[in-house]
């Protein structure tokens, strides 16, 4: 098997399972990553973009060793747009609500609310991040320093597709920073949920199981294929580029697994060839008509729209037909009723015609009958008027009777109310004394229905009135006696008040004298206390002055002693330095004097020699040579000037 897969290594791989190679040539197994992704909700065109370097053929590492890829290494720069609507306040509030619900449901120990999550501090954000990342790495603890570098690094290691800058960690709750960070936290929550679901789900293969469940795209997880891929990958990492042995082993295992019959291979190859030809033909048709699917989809959509229109038209026709049927039924009923009325009228006309044909009266009899009919009608009208007058009079009498009845009932109600207030009714009341003072009005008994209550109620009431008057007189006498007693008590009270007022005046005078004495005593005490306090202050001042003078003298003495010691030390050091310098100076002077004496002796000897040589030479000749030399030098100096 030749290498035909390209592996892209992402940072921070969490799974410890074997790496799976992707065959980009197989349709359905690879999903191309386009720039417009809908992973995080609605797309938004106004989003911040971030650039990052994406290595397509990067350096691969493995637990069994590493090797250099023969495909070469290159990188490309692509802009990844954040499709999440981070400028949408509703979306940000939804993210904050998801974060708040996850924290409260999973036992976040610190206090948190929707209001605090609108603009949290950096410290609160670090607590939330440490709590969330603890689900993926339980032993993780945030470092004490450089958290602004640690958090973006962890997100990058987890494969977060967007960049969190280091500066954003300093201003977490800022309006321009918090939407990006809360979206990253929601992404981390999604990772936690996926990790939890993967941990709770059953393993891909049980012992002895060769095939997994079929997924939505029709792929079956084959344990043999995974083992084959693992072996090829390990061999590939050691430097191999062909895998004939593994191919042969896999082919043998697959034949054993599917129980392949060699005799049927030719028929299968023919069938495979036919299918390949059919695939080629379909691909050619697709190339000839690249937009056939779109046209078919449009045709299907138009046909579906026509079907919907026809269905709506049929429903309208059915409703219209139902209305027409209802109208037809009502018209049929109306026609039947009119026919019955017409038949009835015809029968009545026939009956009346037969009566007219069979009657035996003449015209004079008919006129007489009509005259009698008119007289009877006048009599009926007169009696009707009399009846109406009598009915009106009866109505007036009934109204008068009703008003009288209402007045009597109102008086009886007032009487019963007053009797209940006086505790006369019912019969066993406190003041009834065994009499029944209740009056029952029954108009149907006639005009004398209330006469019996005159003897039943009047005499006991009279007796009660007399007793009440006697009690009232007794109470008045008692009241007058009590008023006299009250007047005497008021007189005594007035005298007592006068006595009390005099005593209060005496007490006030004594209180004033007592207050004056107390004030004088307090003034004396205050004066004594102030004198004592001044003496105490003077004493403290004297003591503090003596102590301060003593401490100052001691401090001065210590300072003088320290200064003396420092001066002695400095003087000793300077004396030693001066002696050393003086000794070196004397040595240098002696050396210099010796060298000068030697130099002077040499100069004297040289001068003697030059004097002797000078005396032996011709002085005039030397002067002439010097003059000529001077003239030549002067001529040379004048030549450049010209």
Swiss-Prot record:
Q: Where is this region: Interaction with PSMC2 and SMC1A?
A: 361-547
Q: Report the superkingdom from the record.
A: Eukaryota
Subunit-level organization = Component of the NDC80 complex, which consists of NDC80/HEC1, CDCA1, SPBC24 and SPBC25. The NDC80 complex is formed by two subcomplexes composed of NDC80/HEC1-CDCA1 and SPBC24-SPBC25. Each subcomplex is formed by parallel interactions through the coiled-coil domains of individual subunits. Formation of a tetrameric complex is mediated by interactions between the C-terminal regions of both subunits of the NDC80/HEC1-CDCA1 subcomplex and the N-terminal regions of both subunits of the SPBC24-SPBC25 complex.
Q: Does the keyword Phosphoprotein apply?
A: yes
According to UniProt, the name of this protein is Kinetochore protein NDC80 homolog
Where is the stretch described as Interaction with the C-terminus of CDCA1 and the SPBC24-SPBC25 subcomplex? 446-642
Q: Which residues carry this modification: N6-acetyllysine?
A: 53, 59, 527
User: What gene does the UniProt entry assign to this protein?
Assistant: Ndc80
Where is the stretch described as Interaction with the N-terminus of CDCA1? 1-445
